[in-house]
């Protein structure tokens, strides 16, 4: 009977066959231990010399790392294993013998591992990170589907920039100029006027020449937009969504979190509602903490965000930033016209901003004024202005960066480990 490592527990004390790769092995004179993986998980295969043919035992001692195999044996309980079971191997068939696998069990430098990313993905820790990424995506669809959102796919080739910045990848669209999308937000706002509550999930591209542990050139975003929704209501959706994702990972990725040595005590405290601090109060807090390198009207850097998040030891919303440091489309704060109704959600443990969101301007005249102030091409935004001409309503939205969220929940140091094939400054291979 053929099965997988993940499903093998259903076949305790039965003989099964598993297709797998050999990740590592050790042996003595009378017993060999094979570390097997098949994509669904990792399992130990035990080969006892007295219980198999001489040929099988010799093969078990000689198999090379990453050779592909069919391994047949009996699944037995093993309380020492993370899985709770292992295989008592009876026979081994080599599908393909690997030679000189470059990523050996010893430590390797980051550049070497990134050059061999297509192979590094096979390691237990990288496998765990990708499984957690997959669970976050699954939980995302679950949350938005259960809360009445419609999935919409905005274009990746665009004629304008939602953020109104110069950090764009330029290309030609036949005889026209086009750009790789920085965000699907403006299109999602249009979709929200048709469907009420919408979300997108797709790649975005930013030509930022940044080498920090938080930045990728290509990354994936979840971007919901909600009609008839104000800023406070949007914050409630955001914290419910993030709480749902964290709880889903804690429930469904216990083996992966253990493989990463992730301290889950902080994740277990993540539950809506999240603390909130205004930009004004955040500046005061930082001054009191001895930060003299920031003044009102300036954006926060990584050390500032980390200090604020560490104070709460939870995800925290920083609200109502100054108008001049935020994009053109954000609704003014009626209590202070120098600020806007927006928030960034800062993850604890130094992982920084994972969500940016705001209430959107719904008044045509004000939006036209903002486009002019930001010296943007009004004609490129004509479709966006139409949303304010025909049945405009209060509406809000946000964007969550998938890779930063994966980094935070999995506890990895750098976002390069959270994308299967990361695109970084000066790295386009593999």
Curated annotation (Swiss-Prot):
Q: What is its EC number?
A: 6.1.1.22
Q: Name one GO biological process term.
A: asparaginyl-tRNA aminoacylation
Q: Which Pfam families does its entry note?
A: tRNA-synt_2, tRNA_anti-codon
| Keywords carried by this UniProt record | Aminoacyl-tRNA synthetase, ATP-binding, Cytoplasm, Ligase, Nucleotide-binding, Protein biosynthesis
Q: What domain of life does the UniProt record list for this protein's source?
A: Bacteria
Q: What is its main location?
A: cytoplasm
Please state where this protein is localized: Cytoplasm
Which Gene Ontology CC terms are recorded?
A: cytoplasm
> Per its UniProt entry, what is the enzyme's top EC class, as one word?
ligase
The reaction(s) catalysed by this protein are: tRNA(Asn) + L-asparagine + ATP = L-asparaginyl-tRNA(Asn) + AMP + diphosphate + H(+)
Looking up InterPro entries in the UniProt record yields: Aa-tRNA-synt_II, aa-tRNA-synth_II, aa-tRNA-synth_II/BPL/LPL, Asn-tRNA-ligase, Asp/Asn-tRNA-synth_IIb, NA-bd_OB-fold, NA-bd_OB_tRNA
Q: Where are the transmembrane segments?
A: none
What are this entry's molecular-function GO terms?
Answer: asparagine-tRNA ligase activity; ATP binding; catalytic activity, acting on a protein; nucleic acid binding; transferase activity
* Family assignment from sequence similarity: Belongs to the class-II aminoacyl-tRNA synthetase family.
Q: How does it assemble?
A: Homodimer.
What NCBIfam families would the database entry show? asnS (TIGR00457), PRK03932.1 (NF003037), PRK05159.1 (NF003483)
Q: What's the protein here called?
A: Asparagine--tRNA ligase
- Organism from which the protein derives: Staphylococcus haemolyticus (strain JCSC1435)
């Amino acid at each position: 009977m053929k099965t997988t490592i993940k499903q093998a527990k259903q076949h305790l004390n039965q003989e099964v066959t598993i297709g797998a790769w050999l990740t590592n092995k050790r042996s003595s004179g009378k017993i060999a231990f094979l570390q097997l993986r098949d994509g669904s998980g990792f399992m130990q295969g035990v080969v006892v010399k007295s219980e198999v043919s001489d040929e099988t035992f010799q093969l078990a001692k000689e198999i090379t790392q990453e050779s592909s195999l069919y391994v047949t044996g009996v699944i037995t309980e093993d309380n020492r294993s993370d899985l709770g079971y292992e295989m008592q191997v009876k026979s081994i068939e080599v599908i393909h013998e690997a030679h000189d696998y470059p990523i050996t069990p010893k430590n390797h430098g980051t550049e070497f591992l990134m050059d061999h990313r297509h192979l590094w993905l096979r390691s237990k820790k990288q496998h765990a990170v990708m499984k957690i990424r997959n669970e976050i995506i699954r939980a995302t669809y679950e949350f938005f589907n259960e809360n009445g959102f419609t999935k919409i796919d905005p274009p990746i080739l665009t004629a304008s920039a939602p953020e109104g910045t110069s950090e764009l990848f330029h290309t030609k669209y036949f005889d026209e100029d086009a750009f790789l999308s920085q965000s699907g937000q403006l299109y999602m706002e249009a979709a929200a006027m048709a469907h009420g509550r919408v979300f997108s999930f797709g790649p975005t591209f930013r030509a930022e020449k940044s080498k920090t542990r938080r930045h990728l050139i290509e990354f994936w975003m979840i971007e919901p937009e909600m009609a008839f929704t104000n800023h406070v209501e949007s914050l409630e959706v955001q914290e419910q969504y993030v709480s749902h994702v964290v709880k889903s990972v804690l429930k469904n990725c216990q083996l992966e979190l253990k493989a990463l040595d992730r301290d889950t005590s902080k994740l277990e405290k993540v539950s809506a509602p999240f603390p909130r601090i205004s930009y004004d109060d955040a500046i005061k807090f930082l001054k009191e903490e001895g930060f003299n390198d920031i003044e009102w009207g300036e954006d926060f850097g990584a050390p500032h965000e980390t200090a604020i998040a560490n104070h709460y030891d939870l995800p925290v919303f920083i609200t109502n930033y100054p108008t001049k440091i935020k994009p053109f489309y954000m609704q003014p704060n009626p209590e202070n016209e120098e600020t806007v109704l927006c928030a960034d959600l800062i993850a604890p443990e130094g992982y920084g901003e994972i969500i940016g969101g705001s209430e959107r301007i719904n008044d045509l005249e004000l939006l036209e004024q903002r486009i002019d102030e930001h010296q943007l091409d009004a004609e490129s935004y004509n479709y966006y202005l139409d949303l304010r001409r025909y049945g405009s309503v209060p509406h809000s939205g946000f964007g969550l960066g998938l890779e930063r969220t994966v980094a935070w929940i999995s506890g990895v140091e750098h976002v390069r480990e959270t994308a299967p094939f990361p695109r970084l400054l000066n790295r386009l291979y593999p």
